[in-house]
Amino acid sequence: MAAQDVFDRSMDEDIALGNMWYEQEFKRSFTLLDMVGFSFSIVTCWTALSGVFIIGIQAGGPPVMIFGWIGVCVFTMLIALAMAEMCSRWPVAGGQYSWVAMLAPPRISRQLSYITGWFMLTGLLAMGAVNNSFGSNYILGQVNLVFPDFVIERWHTVLVAWAVGLFSLAVNVFAPHALHRLSRFVLMWNIVSFIIVITTLLATNHQKQDTGFVFHEFRNTTGFGASMATIVGILQSFFGMCCYDAPSHMTEEMTHASRDAPKAIIMSVMMGAVSGLLFLLTLCFCMGDIEATANSSTGVPVIQIFYDSTQSKSGTCILASMITVIIVMCSIGLLAEGSRSVYAFARDRGLPFSGLLSQVEPKKKIPLNAIFLTVAVQLGLNAIYFGAKTGFETVISIATTGFYVSYSLVFFARLLGYFFHHQASSFDGPYSLPLPVSLGFSAIGLLFLLFASITFNFPSDAPVTFQSMNYTSAAIGLVTLLSLLTWFTTATHRFVGPSDVKHLVVNGIGSAQTLQPTDEDGSSTSKENNGKIFS
């Protein structure tokens, strides 16, 4: 591609960003291939499923894992298609909360956008901590495999998770210019590792399970009835198919965001669905004794399956190390995505100390303060594991719930705005769906996401005790309470969210003057301290 073409496309994207009253502050370096690699490294369903494989083993077994995954992927594809057209129309780092601001009826758009932003950040920051922990589990699991006398303690897990988080911090701070190249490398590594792992397991395992075990044998050790156990088992699939909004938060660093970001969203879901299904099938056919697998001393059932298949500790460590590299690269991507989201929300005055968090380091063109805050929250959430295993298991549910609630609020705003205010009847971005299809996918997606968000609050074992209780509902209630409290105390006077100039003019909604956020003293927020352009 000619340099002039890249420059022209970047200028077009800068103009589109300016139409939402933002100025371009990042360097645009991500191409479509780079963003597919970046997004797939975060979605990377097959490695994500390996991290929560034990849930499926205990709640329903292979049939629930396989068919649950297929069902979740079908619904997720509909959601991704609908989400992609919003990303194409409004390619801005705020992602979900920005789209809600554009789609919801004007009377409630700011409030709904603000709440969406809180849930979005909750999901992103918690997911970063969860991924750090997964990386720690794989590293310590390999140590236990090689040295069976080594007993994994909770504090080991926390310290190694911190190491993963700090490594991600170092890459994001000292090598931000290499992120797009790293994404390309991770894409190739991901695909090659997937092929090697699948091929090795199928070739070395000589005691494969029969089709009856994989597709028909229902297993339930949760203490719940079959129906409840099935719902709990599907949670594995919900977690595995998540974070596909990643390209939307990196759009301000893409050379042709409005065209390529939607493609990256759709392609990452497609690749994740196929790789996840093939990986699950392989694991289920190659699984040995199900109780021994679930109770492996490594703490990672997948590592036990690798060892049972290869009968080689070195071979198992090679396969597990391939996945570990992908998980660490995912941590790097989640930190980049999370920090851009913090920056975007702060730019719209949605957070305390917004002026500080929305600053961009002029030399490296990165939101340095937002990066530091993001990693600090991740490490703080990892520290919960010092105290209780149940507490960190709740963080896993919070991470996925935060994403799913923010997704559902997007479609709620879409339908509410269309049917009650006749907004956004169609999108004029490079990628758009026919109106009936768009509305249909939005309605189906909303129902599916609400179902998923509710089920994340269920405990995973019965009888329910203080230790086994799922505290996700309490945590989500706290997030909701904090968002409402900060809204009524400070944000109601400061937060405005993004504004589409063309949309405002066409619909006669407000003006540049009336929509400006204000500081606590009532003065208008200026371009210099939040990166927004007001005339």
Cite the ranges covered by each PLM segment.
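Membrane-interface "cap" regions at the ends of multi-pass membrane proteins
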Residues: 1-62, 76-77, 81, 494-535
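Transmembrane alpha-helical segments of multi-pass small-molecule transport proteins
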Residues: 69, 113, 143-176, 194-197, ...
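Hydrophobic transmembrane alpha-helices that form the core helical bundles
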Residues: 77-154, 158-165, 169, 327, ...
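Membrane-helix boundary/coupling elements in multi-pass transport proteins
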Residues: 92, 116-135, 236, 241-253, ...
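Membrane-interface loop-to-helix entry segments
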Residues: 156-214, 242, 265-269, 396-409, ...
